[in-house]
C-alpha cells in the first residue's frame, strides 16, 4: 500500500495525539474567528463605528474572541516579566541590579536574541565583572548582544531624541524582540518631571507595540530606610513612570545580613503575585566560575529582612510626622513621603 493511500485511509484513532490536538485547536480558532467576525458585523449593523479618530471600538465579545486567537505570553523571567511587557527593575545603588539584569539577559539569550543597552559600565568594567581569578572569560550565549553609546558619534543635538530614535533603529535592523535598558536615566534626564516622564513612557510604549518588543528598564531608588518595606513610592522619578509599567519588581538589602539581597514583586498585570511581601526571593551575589550572579537561597517574608526601629528612630519619625502635618501636609502625603502606611500616620497624630 502506498503512503498516499495509507494517509487517505487513516482514521482519527490512527492519528497521533499531537495531530488530533492540532486539529481541535484549529477548529476552535476557526470558531473564534467566525464569532469575532459576526460580532463585528453586528456592531456595524447597530451603526457603531469601528474607529473614531485615535480610538478603535470593538464589543467586549469581539475583543476577547480576537485576543483568544493569539497565544498567551510566555514568562521571560520567573513570574516577574512576561513577553510583550514593559517591566521595571529598581534598586538602590550597589545592590546588584545590573548583575541581576545581565543574569536575566543571559538566560533569555539561550533561546532568543537579546539586546542589553549598557549605559552604566565601560567595556573594561564589564569584562572584569565576568572574568575569574585565573583570567578566564565567561562565555555568554551567542544571542546576547551588549550595546553601548558610541561617544564619537555624539553630536550637539538632542541627546534624548537621538537615544529614542536609535532604539527604534536597533529594533528595525536587528529584529531582536527583547530589550534590556540599563538605565532609564539615559533615556531622559527629566524623569522627575511628570510631563517629561509621561512623554518618555508614551514613546517607549509606541516602540513596544510597533515592534512587538519586551522591555526591561532599570531604575534607581533614592536612599531608603532599611526599616521600611519597599513600595512603589521608592521608584525614583515621577509617579507617572510607575503607572506606565506593566510589571515592576525591586531588589532590597537585608538588614540582618549585608551580603543578602531580597527580590520583591510590586506590580503584576499577567498572572498573580508570587513574590510579594510574604514570599520574597532571598539571594546572595556570588561569582561561580567567571559568572557573577544572584544565587537563590530560599524565600522569606520581607519583614524578616527589615531593620527593627530603635527608640531613637521611632522618636525621630514621630517628630517628622508632626512637623509635616503642621506644614499642612495631608495624611496621605506624609505617608507617601515617609513610605509608611496612612493608618500609622493617623495613629501617631492621635497620640
Predicted regions and their residues:
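C-terminal regions of RecA-like/P-loop NTPase motor modules
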Residues: 20-42, 54, 172-173, 210, ...
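Hydrophobic positions on the alpha1 helix immediately C-terminal to the Walker A/P-loop
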Residues: 100, 104
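Conserved catalytic network of the ASCE P-loop NTPase/AAA+ motor domain
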Residues: 108, 138-139, 170-173, 206-211, ...
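Positively charged N-terminal leader segments that act as targeting/secretion signals
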Residues: 2-16
Amino acid at each position: 500500500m502506498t503512503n498516499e493511500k495509507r494517509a487517505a485511509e487513516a482514521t482519527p484513532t490512527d492519528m497521533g495525539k499531537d495531530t488530533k490536538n492540532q486539529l481541535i485547536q484549529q477548529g476552535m480558532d476557526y470558531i473564534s474567528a467566525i464569532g469575532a467576525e459576526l460580532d463585528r458585523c453586528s456592531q456595524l449593523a447597530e451603526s457603531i463605528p469601528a474607529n473614531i479618530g485615535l480610538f478603535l471600538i470593538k464589543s467586549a465579545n469581539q475583543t476577547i474572541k480576537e485576543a483568544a486567537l493569539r497565544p498567551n505570553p510566555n514568562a521571560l523571567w520567573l513570574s516577574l516579566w512576561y513577553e510583550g511587557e514593559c517591566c521595571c527593575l529598581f534598586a538602590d545603588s550597589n545592590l546588584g541590579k545590573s548583575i541581576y539584569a545581565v543574569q536575566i539577559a543571559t538566560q533569555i539569550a539561550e533561546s532568543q536574541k537579546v539586546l542589553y543597552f549598557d549605559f552604566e559600565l565601560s567595556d573594561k568594567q564589564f569584562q572584569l565583572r565576568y572574568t575569574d581569578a585565573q583570567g578566564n572569560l565567561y562565555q555568554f550565549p551567542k544571542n546576547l548582544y551588549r550595546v553601548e553609546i558610541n561617544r564619537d558619534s555624539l553630536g550637539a543635538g538632542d541627546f534624548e531624541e537621538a537615544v529614542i530614535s536609535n532604539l527604534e533603529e536597533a529594533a528595525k535592523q536587528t529584529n531582536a524582540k527583547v530589550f534590556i535598558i540599563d538605565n532609564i536615566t539615559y533615556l531622559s534626564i527629566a524623569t522627575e518631571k511628570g510631563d517629561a516622564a509621561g512623554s518618555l513612557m508614551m514613546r517607549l510604549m509606541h516602540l513596544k507595540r510597533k515592534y512587538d518588543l519586551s522591555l526591561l528598564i532599570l531604575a534607581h531608588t533614592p536612599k531608603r530606610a532599611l526599616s521600611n518595606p519597599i513600595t512603589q513610592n521608592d521608584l525614583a522619578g515621577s509617579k507617572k513612570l510607575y503607572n506606565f509599567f506593566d510589571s515592576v519588581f525591586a531588589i532590597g538589602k537585608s538588614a540582618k545580613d549585608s551580603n543578602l539581597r531580597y527580590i520583591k514583586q510590586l506590580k503584576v498585570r499577567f498572572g498573580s503575585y508570587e513574590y510579594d511581601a510574604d514570599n520574597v526571593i532571598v539571594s546572595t551575589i556570588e561569582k561561580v566560575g567567571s559568572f557573577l550572579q544572584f544565587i537563590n537561597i530560599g524565600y522569606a517574608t520581607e519583614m524578616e529582612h527589615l531593620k527593627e526601629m530603635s527608640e531613637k528612630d521611632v522618636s525621630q519619625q514621630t517628630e517628622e510626622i508632626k512637623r509635616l502635618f503642621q506644614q499642612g501636609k495631608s495624611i496621605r502625603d506624609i505617608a507617601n513621603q515617609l513610605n509608611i502606611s496612612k493608618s500609622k500616620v493617623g495613629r501617631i497624630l492621635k497620640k
